[in-house]
Amino acid sequence: MPAPRTICSLLLLSMLWMDLAMAGSSFLSPEHQKLQRKEPKKPSGRLKPRALEGQFDPDVGSQEEGAEDELEIRFNAPFNIGIKLSGAQSLQHGQTLGKFLQDILWEEAEETLADE
């Protein structure tokens, strides 16, 4: 019968050999893919500037006074853009926002005419 020292050594070497064999497994193997799969993070439904957090939150139930006259602008370019402003905000930022939109739409119109 082999000595206990020899049996322990063989057992240790076989365990190390198994770890080495598992470490060298292909990244494409199904077992490795199962181990590496993680649940993707889902982004929140709405993105809000930090200064406006809670002002227009539908969960709160009540909005700031003066929010009855809201301005909402949505348009589709290569991507969707939506902007929602309260009455006070539209008075404060409306002119700048209008100029910004006009510049964007004017550049797009010029590119369309140049392509034709």
Swiss-Prot record:
Residues bearing a lipid moiety (O-decanoyl serine): S26
Location of Leucine amide modifications: L97
Localisation: Secreted
Major location category of this protein: secreted
Residues where lipid is bound covalently (O-hexanoyl serine): S26
Gene this chain is encoded by: GHRL
GO molecular function: ghrelin receptor binding; growth hormone-releasing hormone activity; hormone activity; protein tyrosine kinase activator activity
Presence of keyword rRNA processing: no
Coiled coil regions, renumbered to chain: none
Organism the protein comes from: Capra hircus (Goat)
Keyword list, A-Z: Amidation, Hormone, Lipoprotein, Secreted, Signal
Covalently lipidated residues, kind O-octanoyl serine: S26
Protein name: Appetite-regulating hormone
Propeptide feature ranges: 51-74, 98-116
Gene Ontology CC terms: axon; extracellular region; extracellular space
Region Disordered, residue ranges: 29-67
InterPro entries assigned: Motilin_assoc, Motilin_ghrelin, Preproghrelin
Secretion signal span: 1-23
GO biological process: actin polymerization or depolymerization; decidualization; dendrite development; gastric acid secretion; negative regulation of apoptotic process; negative regulation of endothelial cell proliferation; negative regulation of inflammatory response; negative regulation of insulin secretion
Stretches with biased composition (Basic and acidic residues): 31-42
Sequence similarity: Belongs to the motilin family.
Keyword Hydrolase: no
Pfam family of the protein (one): Motilin_assoc
Post-translational modification: O-octanoylated by GOAT/MBOAT4. O-octanoylation is essential for ghrelin activity.
